Amino acid sequence: GVVVRHADLLPATQKKAATGRKLETRFTRGEPHARKRMATVAAVYYIEPDVRDAASVIAGLRRIKPATETKRPRPQNKRVWASLERPLSAVIAEMFDEAQRMDPERKRPWLVLVDGDKKLETAIRKTARARGAEVNLVLDAIHALQYLWAAGHKLCEEGTPELEKWVLDRFERLLDGKASDVAAGMRRSATKRGLSAQARAPIDTAAKYFLQRKNLMHYDLLLEAGTPIATGVIEGTCRTLINDRLDITGARWSLKGAEAILKLRALMQSGDFDDYWAFHTEREHHRNHASQYADEKPPALALRGPKPRLRLVK
């Protein structure tokens, strides 16, 4: 999210901002800040397969180096962009346009990593159907991991090795493609311990979430195929494209100003700035010069040779 002027907030956010505040100089606990407008961020790239298994992913989380360390493949031809102004559907359409440009014959599998937002998933499926594109939606595995941590805090003492072991054991089972088993096991644990409805709420929420999205959580097949299972590229893009420039202390942006900055930073990070600048200067020349003449054809200039220079002869 980016802090913008009140007039540039979405209507729902403006309504929250209009609620009375207890203090004039700072927010109190629980009061909505209601100062930010959320950006939609997208990235399209190609990456070579990197076959892994659940155990190697868990080892990576534990920062355990493998016996034979190999260089991980890096994203290629990566293009990124973000928008505060345009609707979600427009950003998704641009994402599909770029994917089509990179793979016009659709020889490669198209994977779309999402963070669990239902509106985002619905919009992607709708656009894919309209374009006749076959895409595989994948839920960010790290996003699923956060639900396990929230549930684990209700079953294990916070900050203990038992909590970490409980979470990682179930995360490994998620990576093995056993989302339904994990959901059922968590609910049984809550029932056996006799937790109240309020105490077990995070457990039931996580279980319901996994069951509803188990079709997006075939991590065992994805790891075997060597495809990504997490949105690390998007997380990095959010930091470098948005936060490093727009989320600075004391900044409050206009919508048009923030959108312009996002476009320029996206061009730089995607390696397209030189092409854009050549196009920009050509259009500026046309607007300020060529368009002022009939038929937009400036008269040819008679080029003169260099003027003779005077020399002091002694």
For each feature predicted by the language model, list its residue ranges:
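Catalytic center-proximal scaffold of phosphoryl-transfer enzymes
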Residues: 1-314
